[in-house]
């Protein structure tokens, strides 16, 4: 049991320096970024998703392209997302962008996580009436059980990582 605990501890902290750096650059909570990485890839920088997502934060081509363009990075290609630093920078930038779309709400992070997971078009469909500004109503309006679970699991894991600085 002690060996399992030690291995999990090492894995849990394997990307801390990269996470802290990206969080600092994009003025984001490192505990949130780490929780997203935990949920997306369990800290595996070579993780591959079913529809082309890559790396720690499971970034897709479109998101990576937006990040590279916004940051003035030329000659960027999707394969570079296997690089942990590039992946976490792109993912953190993209999550910040998603959260920024929802500043008018009581909890922009909830809406941003839904957008990161399910896409902006779904969030726009779910955020009508009370759900437009009330995160509890918004979560209830989400039609995908996996997206609801995604948001709640990241919230719980974020609390576990709260001391990351």
Where are these regions (language model features)?
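Export/targeting segments at the very N-terminus of extracytoplasmic proteins
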Residues: 1-45, 68, 85, 103, ...
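Cell-wall polysaccharide-cleaving catalytic domain and substrate-binding groove, primarily
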Residues: 18, 38-58, 62-63, 119
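Short glycine/serine- and small hydrophobic-enriched flexible loop segments
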Residues: 38, 93-100
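Catalytic and substrate-binding regions of cell-wall glycan-acting enzymes that process beta-1,4-linked
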Residues: 111-165
